[in-house]
């Protein structure tokens, strides 16, 4: 038995570690440095129906314990991704999780109906942190009813399991998670970035041209752990955890809190080899902590 194996809807993972969406592109650059078959899965860059240039620059800023970004979902659009990006990933055995974004419900439905055409795509990650342009720009993921409706609409057309990415910028993460689960979501990914800002002391203006950006990195890990623990306390829905993972101890902390697998984001920019390193280190750390397998760790968590 593979002691690192994880089975969740649509995904047979050889290990629980994967790069997070937006921090790995579509894998081509990283494939020059290591075998992508080492990874548990790959969360690909967000896809929208039409190409997007993203936000004006500067759109990235370092912080004391992480970074801010306001990339604006820059991507080449659905047709290009289906024709050029996903075919490259089909050579690997590693399952691909396609991140889908949009400005309207129709955008999401359009992409989700077709993204499964690639045999590499085994699941969808629904990015509901996007502003809903038909409802005053408020993010889809901040209202339980809107999140429920969008999830249901996507589930009606998707040919692969749907994991919904939760925004931490809400008053009650549990009510959002429960609404999404009730709509038929196969799993959750959490958390997305926290809204933040930095000021340039010389210009007296925000460093990010957009004003605000998403805070990621080690600074948000305690928030991610807390939110995963809260959702796990009321639901058995599969969870892919993310938010500030740097070390193998972070991976285990996420798993103990309630995640079934873990995605690594910002650290890919600091160390492109972070994912294979964590995969290599995980069994040794499990031995030191008396963890025989991830399956047993999950049973231990369930019985508490």
UniProtKB/Swiss-Prot annotation:
What is catalysed by this protein? (S)-dihydroorotate + NAD(+) = orotate + NADH + H(+)
Pathway as given in its UniProt record: Pyrimidine metabolism; UMP biosynthesis via de novo pathway; orotate from (S)-dihydroorotate (NAD(+) route): step 1/1
The record's subcellular locations are:
Cytoplasm
UniProt xrefs under Pfam families: DHO_dh
Per its UniProt entry, what is the enzyme's top EC class, as one word? oxidoreductase
InterPro entries to which the protein is assigned, alphabetical: Aldolase_TIM (IPR013785), DHO_dehydrogenase (IPR050074), DHOD_1B (IPR033888), Dihydroorotate_DH_1 (IPR024920), Dihydroorotate_DH_1_2 (IPR012135), Dihydroorotate_DH_cat (IPR005720), Dihydroorotate_DH_CS (IPR001295), Dihydroorotate_DH_I (IPR049622)
Q: May I have one GO cellular component term?
A: cytoplasm
Is Oxidoreductase set as a keyword in this record?
Answer: yes
Any one of the GO BP annotations: 'de novo' pyrimidine nucleobase biosynthetic process
PROSITE patterns in UniProt: DHODEHASE_1, DHODEHASE_2
Record EC number? 1.3.1.14
Q: How is the cofactor bound?
A: Binds 1 FMN per subunit.
Gene Ontology MF terms in the entry: dihydroorotate dehydrogenase (NAD+) activity; dihydroorotate dehydrogenase activity
Record: residues binding substrate: 45, 69-73, 127, 192-193
The positions annotated for binding FMN are 21, 45-46, 99, 127, 165, 191, 217, 243-244, 265-266
Its required cofactor(s), as named, are:
FMN
- Keyword annotations for this protein? Cytoplasm, Flavoprotein, FMN, NAD, Oxidoreductase, Pyrimidine biosynthesis
Which residue positions are annotated as catalytic? 130 (nucleophile)
HAMAP family linked to this entry: DHO_dh_type1
Family as reported in the entry's similarity comment: Belongs to the dihydroorotate dehydrogenase family. Type 1 subfamily.
Q: How does it assemble?
A: Heterotetramer of 2 PyrK and 2 PyrD type B subunits.
Described function: Catalyzes the conversion of dihydroorotate to orotate with NAD(+) as electron acceptor.
Q: What is this protein called?
A: Dihydroorotate dehydrogenase B (NAD(+)), catalytic subunit
Q: Which organism is it from?
A: Listeria monocytogenes serovar 1/2a (strain ATCC BAA-679 / EGD-e)
Q: Which gene encodes it?
A: pyrD
């Amino acid at each position: 038995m593979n002691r690192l194996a994880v089975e969740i809807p649509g995904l047979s993972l050889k290990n629980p570690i994967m790069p997070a969406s937006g921090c790995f592109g579509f894998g081509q650059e990283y494939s020059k440095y290591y075998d992508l078959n080492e990874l548990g899965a790959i969360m690909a860059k967000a896809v929208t129906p039409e190409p997007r240039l993203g936000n004006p620059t500067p759109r990235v800023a370092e912080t004391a314990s992480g970074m801010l970004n306001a990339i604006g979902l820059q991507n080449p659009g659905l047709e290009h991704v289906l024709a050029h990006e996903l075919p490259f990933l089909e050579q690997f055995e590693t399952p691909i999780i396609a991140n889908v974004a949009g400005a309207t419900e129709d955008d999401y439905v359009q992409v989700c109906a077709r993204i499964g055409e690639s045999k590499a795509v085994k699941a969808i990650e629904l990015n509901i942190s996007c502003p809903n342009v038909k409802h005053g720009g408020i993010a889809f993921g901040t209202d339980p009813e809107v999140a429920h409706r969008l999830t249901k609409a996507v589930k009606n057309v998707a040919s692969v399991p749907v994991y919904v990415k939760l925004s931490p910028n809400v008053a009650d993460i549990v009510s959002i998670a429960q609404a999404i689960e009730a709509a038929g979501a196969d799993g959750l990914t959490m958390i997305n970035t926290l809204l933040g800002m930095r000021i340039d002391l010389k210009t007296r203006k925000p460093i990010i041209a957009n004003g605000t950006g998403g805070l990621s990195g080690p600074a948000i890990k305690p928030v991610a752990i807390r939110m995963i623990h809260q959702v796990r306390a009321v639901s058995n829905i599969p969870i892919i955890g993310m938010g500030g993972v740097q070390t193998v101890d972070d991976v285990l902390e996420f798993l103990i809190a309630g995640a079934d697998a873990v995605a690594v984001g910002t650290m890919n920019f600091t160390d492109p080899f972070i994912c294979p390193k964590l995969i290599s280190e995980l069994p040794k750390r499990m031995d030191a902590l008396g963890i025989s397998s991830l399956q047993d760790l999950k049973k231990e968590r369930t019985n508490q």
